């Protein structure tokens, strides 16, 4: 992941703190899933990873942990957490699309 370029690109579209949050979420995905977002983008435009990051309200009601393997604290809202992570990764893939 090209952290610096991504953050600079984000700052053109949103405020500094939001850009840092999106970047940190993407870094968390890379670290916890042992992947590189650039590799995922090259593989299939990121669609495989985005599918792995999907988490439904039904899964939340059933108290299921995410299938991708990410762990959350006991009282965390996993649905919101997973959707925030997915939105950040989707934004990274959007950024990558502007570089091609």
Locations of regions flagged by a protein language model:
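C-terminal alpha-helical interaction appendages
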Residues: 1-12, 41-44
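Non-catalytic DNA-binding core/recognition domains of DNA-processing enzymes
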Residues: 14-99
